């Protein structure tokens, strides 16, 4: 697989990382906020929540479970992308640059797509095809999971300590559960 460092920007879509074949048989998409970066509930509360402050993401702690899972994906050369929605009122450019720096520090060599649009539409646009059952999204937010499954793909709810396992049928909170979910819907990590 040939890879090239690149920037890709189209409409409200920004990609940074290494380009590889978009015709992959399947793809794993991983959310950032509340999945690879720990979610702190208090940071989202109040009139002037902390998450709206400049460079907030730089202070987020990495989730060791997802870091370990990404290292497995890298070891087995399983295609994955981080897919992060950056919504107003956040400063789009500042937020995306902070997240790129954060990924470079904690999981170098990772690819990321930022969008202000639907994660499904963004993934389909990037892949150049409709989502299919083997395309997996690991996210912590039910509306993203619902939209993903409604598009015919597989959604895994990552339990981060702030969300409920009772509101989704396919969940994972540790490396073993993530591997089991992946093995059930993708190829296999042994």
Tell me what each language-model feature is.
Residues 136-171:
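Acidic, Mg2+-coordinating phosphoryl-transfer loop and its flanking beta/alpha structural elements
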Residues 115-148:
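Conserved Lys-Pro-Asp/Glu-containing loop-to-beta segment of HAD-superfamily phosphomonoesterases
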Residues 7-26:
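Short, Lys/Arg-enriched N-terminal segments with co-localized hydrophobic residues
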Residues 25-60:
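Active-site neighborhood of HAD-like aspartate-dependent phosphohydrolases
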Residues 66-96, 103:
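Substrate-recognition element of Asp-dependent hydrolases with the DxDx(T/V) motif
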Residues 161-190:
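Charged phosphate-binding loop/patch that engages nucleotide di/tri-phosphates or the phosphate backbone
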Residues 59-63, 78-90, 111-114, 156:
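Short, well-structured secondary-structure segments
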């Amino acid at each position: 697989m040939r890879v090239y460092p690149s920037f890709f920007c189209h409409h409200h879509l920004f990609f940074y990382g290494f380009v590889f074949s978009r015709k992959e048989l399947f793809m794993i998409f991983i959310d950032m906020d509340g999945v690879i970066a720990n979610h702190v509930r208090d940071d989202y509360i109040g009139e002037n929540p902390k998450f709206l402050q400049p460079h907030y993401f730089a202070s987020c702690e990495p989730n060791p479970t997802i870091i370990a899972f990404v290292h497995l994906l890298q070891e087995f050369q399983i295609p994955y992308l981080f897919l992060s929605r950056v919504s107003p009122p956040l400063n789009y450019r500042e937020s995306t640059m902070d997240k790129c720096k954060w990924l470079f520090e904690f999981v170098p060599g990772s690819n990321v797509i930022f969008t202000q649009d639907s994660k499904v539409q963004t993934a389909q646009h990037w892949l150049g095809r409709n989502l299919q059952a083997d395309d997996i999204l690991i996210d912590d937010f039910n509306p993203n999971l619902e939209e993903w499954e409604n598009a015919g793909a597989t959604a895994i709810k990552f339990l981060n300590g702030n969300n409920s396992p009772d509101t989704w049928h396919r969940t994972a909170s540790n490396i073993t559960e993530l591997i089991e979910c992946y093995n059930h819907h993708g190829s296999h990590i042994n």
